[in-house]
Swiss-Prot record:
InterPro entries: CD2/SLAM_rcpt (IPR015631), Ig-like_dom (IPR007110), Ig-like_dom_sf (IPR036179), Ig-like_fold (IPR013783), Ig_sub (IPR003599), Ig_V-set (IPR013106). The keyword GTP-binding does not apply. Self-ligand receptor of the signaling lymphocytic activation molecule (SLAM) family. SLAM receptors triggered by homo- or heterotypic cell-cell interactions are modulating the activation and differentiation of a wide variety of immune cells and thus are involved in the regulation and interconnection of both innate and adaptive immune response. Activities are controlled by presence or absence of small cytoplasmic adapter proteins, SH2D1A/SAP and/or SH2D1B/EAT-2. Triggers cytolytic activity only in natural killer cells (NK) expressing high surface densities of natural cytotoxicity receptors. Phosphorylation in NK cells upon engagment by SLAMF6-expressing target cells is leading to receptor activation. It comes from Homo sapiens. The modification Phosphoserine is found at residue 278. Residues 1-21 form the signal peptide. Disulfide bonds join 147-214, 153-195. Glycans are attached at residues 58, 87, 137, 144, 161, 178, 203. This is SLAM family member 6. SUPFAM superfamilies: Immunoglobulin. One of its GO terms (biological process) is innate immune response. The modification Phosphotyrosine is found at residues 274, 309.
Length: 332
């Protein structure tokens, strides 16, 4: 319990009038890499014997050390959360391993001697090692063959401590992750654009070729244009075939209708044959149509013999039989 008593005695004995005030000190900025180790350096007063050292983290006691000239120092870790990851050098500088994001904060070392006290302040930042830098692009090709590039740079797990900039030929073009440039192959030579991502512990870079990106866009534009041309051609061919079929069908219907209209009443009458059957007292007419049959008009000649056949009645009554001369008289 001696170390605890001495620590409390140090806190109460060295007030604002006996130590350097916190407001007048500039903390030392120390950057640590997530998962790795960091050391907070400690300097001793020259020519003075150190009684004890207290390490604080965010104003909470972290460790209490009592140096000895003839034996190993007494080291008492007062923060169990960081106890297994704490270590001290021969000069009692603090080493913190397997860094975590929660280790970020303010650290202080209070060194007590017989005549004075020294306060060292630190600000520890835990940063991620940058990795997996990528550049995405959205390119557009105009009709005048000018290529417009929209470039975006990114890294994995980026935070506010990561900065981006774009460079070309050693000149900084932008201090943002986004860059928009126009490139004309007719007047511009091959140009590379480099994105640089960095934080306090690491940096990455990635370069892209404007010529390569624009060539890819041109190929895509040509392929798209060819596909549209082929689709348009196929649609035109199918439309022409459908239109041709409609015209042929309409023409066929018109020819059929015209043929029907050219047949006059006389030809229609000639194409009809009537058969008269008179069973008993009823008469039944039947007609047979001979479409498109060629019919010759019969013209009687002088020497032709005209024969008329009488209708046979199937009734039992006997009909008188007329002679050929009588029949001819009746016709006349």
């Amino acid at each position: 319990m001696l170390w605890l008593f001495q620590s409390l005695l140090f806190v109460f004995c060295f007030g604002p009038g006996n130590v350097v005030s916190q407001s007048s000190l500039t903390p030392l900025m120390v950057n640590g890499i997530l998962g790795e180790s960091v050391t907070l350096p400690l300097e001793f007063p020259a020519g003075e014997k150190v009684n004890f050292i207290t390490w604080l983290f965010n104003e909470t006691s972290l460790a209490f050390i009592v140096p000895h000239e003839t034996k190993s120092p007494e080291i008492h870790v007062t923060n169990p959360k960081q106890g297994k990851r704490l270590n001290f050098t021969q000069s009692y500088s603090l080493q913190l391993s397997n860094l975590k994001m929660e280790d970020t904060g303010s650290y202080r070392a209070q060194i007590s001697t017989k005549t004075s006290a020294k306060l060292s302040s630190y600000t520890l930042r835990i940063l991620r090692q940058l990795r997996n830098i990528q550049v995405t692009n959205h390119s557009q090709l105009f009709q005048n063959m000018t290529c417009e590039l929209h470039l975006t740079c990114s890294v994995e797990d980026a935070d506010d401590n990561v900065s981006f900039r774009w460079e070309a030929l050693g000149n900084t073009l932008s201090s943002q992750p986004n860059l928009t440039v126009s490139w004309d192959p007719r007047i511009s030579s091959e140009q590379d654009y480099t994105c640089i991502a960095e934080n306090a512990v690491s940096n990455l870079s990635f370069s892209v070729s404007a010529q390569k990106l624009c060539e890819d866009v041109k190929i895509q534009y040509t392929d798209t244009k060819m596909i549209l041309f082929m689709v348009s051609g196929i649609c035109i061919v199918f439309g022409f075939i459908i239109l041709l079929l409609l015209v042929l069908r309409k023409r066929r219907d018109s020819l059929s209708l015209s043929t029907q209209r050219t047949q006059g009443p006389a030809e229609s009458a000639r194409n009809l044959e009537y058969v008269s059957v008179s069973p008993t007292n009823n008469t039944v007419y039947a007609s047979v149509t001979h479409s498109n049959r060629e019919t010759e008009i019969w013209t009687p000649r002088e020497n032709d013999t005209i024969t008329i056949y009488s209708t046979i009645n199937h009734s039992k009554e006997s009909k008188p039989t007329f002679s050929r001369a009588t029949a001819l008289d009746n016709v006349v």
